[in-house]
Structure formats: structure tokens, C-alpha cells
């Protein structure tokens, strides 16, 4: 989608969490009679946009790697930090030691931050357990949080996030473990909608990624993939071959791969904050992807190591000023396209009658959202109720 509708002097009304009216205020005044108990938000002078949809997060984890940021700023590489015991495997150790209750408790404040920044729906991945039981623990925590927190969560199984240390010299056995043990149990318990793989040099090859995602598809888990983040590693081609709903990162994607993504109907979910914090020196070619008719979504990639911001407005600012998107394209990327990337566009992502009443009230015109470092959000509405 490329064009966002706009109504001036507008009103929005909901009942039982669903939008029942959106249109000119004059029409609302004679069509809708608010109940005495109704909450009324005066948005005079404000833009009201759909609640943001964050289509790629690693928000559930235990442990703390903020100290690695200082090492990185001092010039240490990710490989050097990993060799010192840091990186993903540091988070794995902490997450394996955590219970469902502990993961819920440490994640809830992160979701609160996301909500205050306007996010009302988000994807949440496992992938810091890397054993059957700890991956299930993460997904059970995600299910609990989805039930208890205002943000709706789309659960993704990502046992193929990294090869754990105990399998380092027998990676084929770990791939088989993911396919033969993890995926069937995740599907049996109904803990995930999606299956994701980190297809990257030194992690999972395109062939391994294809096998894992096909196994997920056969078990009822829809495919998405981390692709071409650190180099041209073939993940985008895997996404196109499988008609995956989303290929994420795509910092190193060429025109041939982009055309294949467009032909296959794959959403390019771009994560400019990840490229920014990892100091990659380049961003995904968002403008080129849009010109080649690839639908573009934007997400935070909030995670313990290289995604320190839970704010989609910050991501929008990067997308506009570092990747060449217009404000309208950035809004579409964080709303309806992101909802489509999560297979939720029939329910959220736009302000339409019948959809969930998820909305963000901006303290001024929508361009205020691009003011990085300050919050331009006056109110966040989730299911028709003010949630932040």
C-alpha cells in the first residue's frame, strides 16, 4: 500500500473495542450518541493515526547486555564481544535460567515502553533458549503476556536463531533437533503462529533455513526470515521461494532478489534502528524496494544487544531521514503494511469501521512523530480504551 487516506475535522467512535464510525465530525454528531460512561478524548489540533504495529521484536529475554554497548562504542566488534562470552549466547545463558513468571516480569516494562511509544500490536520471538524446554518457556511467557498486557502479541518460534554452544561442532544435529523435536512440540501446544530463521553467514545457511521453514510450514507455522542483514547471504531468495510473508533486515539485497520478493508477494520488513545501533554504515535500500513494488514495513528489532529503542516513531524518523521514505510511507510501514506482515491487516493497521479501535493521538500534526528524542504522543488507545 502506498497511499494513506486523510480526513480533516474528523471523529472516531468505537463500541466494544471496534470502530463504529470514522469520518467528518459533523456526520458523527448526528449519527453517534455517546453513552454517559463513554470516554471522550479531545483531539483538537491533533493527528490521529492507527495504532502502530511492530512486526519484528526480540522483546522477551532475560539478562542484561547494556555493558556491551560501551565496548562497541570503544571499537570492539561483535565477534570480539562474543569471544569474551557476550553476544546472543550471553542472553541464552540468562534466558535458560529463567522461569515463565520471571520472563513475564522482566518483559512487561519493555512492553509498557512500547505502548507509550504508540505500539498496540507486536510480533514477539523466541530464540534465546535454544533448547526444547527453554524455547517452550519463552513461548509460554509470550502467551501469558499476550493475555495480560494491552499490546496484542503475534508469537514466533525462532529456535533457529543461533547454534548453541553445545552443538557448535555438530550443527547438523541441531538443525535436526529444531526440525524433529522443537517444531512438532511448538505446533502441538499451539504456541506460535510463525517460524523464523536467522539466515546469515556463520549462522544458518540458505539450505538449512529452507529445511527448517518448510518443516514449520508442514506443521502449520507460517514462514518469515532474517535475511541479508550482514551480507548477501541468500535469505531473500529463500523468502521468495517459500512465498514467506516477510523477509526482514535486507540491508544487502539486490534488484534481482527484490524483484523476486515482489513477484512472491513478500513484505520487506526493514529495521533501520538495528543498522543504526550496529553501526553497519548502510541501511536497507528502502526507496529502491518501494520502486520495485515490494511492500515495505518498518519494525524496531528491539532486543538485548543491538536494538535499544522500543520506539516506532524513532524508526520512522530513521526511515525518513536515512532511508529516503516520505512521512506517509513511514506511517504505512508502521501500520497497515506491518499488520499485513503479521497477517493481521483485516483486524488492525488502519482506522476502518469494524476493525479494532487502536489509535495514536499525536500532539500536533503527524510530522511531529519524526522529532526523535521527544514524545509527540498525547494518548494511545487500545481496543477503544485509553491505554497510555
Which residues does each predicted region cover?
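N-terminal metal-binding scaffold of metallo-dependent hydrolase/deaminase domains
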Residues: 1-34
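Divalent metal-coordination and catalytic microenvironments
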Residues: 12, 17, 45, 56, ...
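Metal-associated gating/positioning segment near the N- to mid-region
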Residues: 35, 39-106
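Metal-coordinating catalytic core of metallo-dependent amide/deamination hydrolases
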Residues: 89-108, 112, 120-233
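Structural motif
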Residues: 117, 189-190, 219, 242, ...
Amino acid at each position: 500500500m502506498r497511499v494513506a487516506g486523510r480526513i480533516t475535522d474528523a471523529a472516531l467512535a468505537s463500541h466494544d473495542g471496534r470502530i463504529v464510525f470514522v469520518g467528518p465530525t459533523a456526520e458523527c454528531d448526528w449519527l453517534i450518541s455517546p453513552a454517559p460512561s463513554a470516554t471522550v478524548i479531545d483531539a483538537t489540533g491533533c493527528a490521529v493515526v492507527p495504532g502502530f504495529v511492530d512486526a519484528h521484536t526480540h522483546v522477551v529475554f532475560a539478562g542484561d547486555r547494556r555493558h556491551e554497548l560501551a565496548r562497541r562504542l570503544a571499537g570492539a566488534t561483535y565477534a570480539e564481544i562474543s569471544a569474551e562470552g557476550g553476544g546472543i549466547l550471553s542472553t541464552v545463558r540468562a534466558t535458560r535460567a529463567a522461569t515463565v513468571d520471571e520472563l513475564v516480569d522482566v518483559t512487561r516494562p519493555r512492553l509498557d515502553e512500547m505502548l507509550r511509544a504508540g505500539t498496540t500490536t507486536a510480533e514477539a520471538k523466541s530464540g534465546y533458549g535454544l533448547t526444547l524446554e527453554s524455547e517452550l518457556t519463552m513461548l509460554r511467557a509470550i502467551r501469558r503476556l499476550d493475555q495480560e498486557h494491552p499490546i496484542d502479541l503475534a508469537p514466533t518460534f525462532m529456535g533457529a536463531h543461533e547454534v548453541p554452544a553445545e552443538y557448535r561442532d555438530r550443527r547438523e544435529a541441531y538443525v535436526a533437533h529444531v526440525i524433529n523435536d522443537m517444531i512438532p512440540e511448538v505446533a502441538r501446544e499451539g504456541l506460535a503462529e510463525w517460524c523464523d530463521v536467522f539466515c546469515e553467514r556463520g549462522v544458518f545457511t540458505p539450505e538449512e533455513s529452507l529445511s527448517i521453514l518448510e518443516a514449520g510450514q508442514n506443521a502449520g507455522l507460517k514462514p518469515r526470515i532474517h535475511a541479508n542483514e550482514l551480507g548477501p547471504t541468500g535469505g531473500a531468495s529463500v523468502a521468495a521461494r517459500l512465498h514467506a510473508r516477510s523477509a526482514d533486515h535486507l540491508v544487502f539485497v539486490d534488484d534481482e532478489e527484490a524483484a523476486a520478493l515482489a513477484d512472491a508477494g513478500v513484505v520487506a520488513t526493514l529495521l533501520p534502528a538495528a543498522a543504526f545501533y550496529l553501526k553497519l554504515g548502510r541501511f536497507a535500500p528502502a526507496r529502491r524496494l518501494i520502486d520495485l513494488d515490494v511492500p515495505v514495513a518498518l519494525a524496531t528489532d528491539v532486543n538485548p544487544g543491538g536494538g535499544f529503542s522500543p520506539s516506532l516513531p524513532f524508526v520512522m524518523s530513521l526511515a525518513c531521514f536515512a532511508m529516503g521514505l516520505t512521512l506517509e510511507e513511514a506511517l504505512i510501514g508502521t501500520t497497515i503494511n506491518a499488520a499485513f506482515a503479521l497477517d493481521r491487516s483485516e483486524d488492525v493497521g488502519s482506522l476502518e469501521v469494524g476493525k479494532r479501535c487502536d489509535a495514536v493521538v499525536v500532539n500536533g500534526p503527524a510530522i511531529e512523530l519524526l522529532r526523535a528524542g521527544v514524545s509527540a504522543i498525547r494518548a494511545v488507545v487500545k481496543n477503544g480504551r485509553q491505554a497510555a
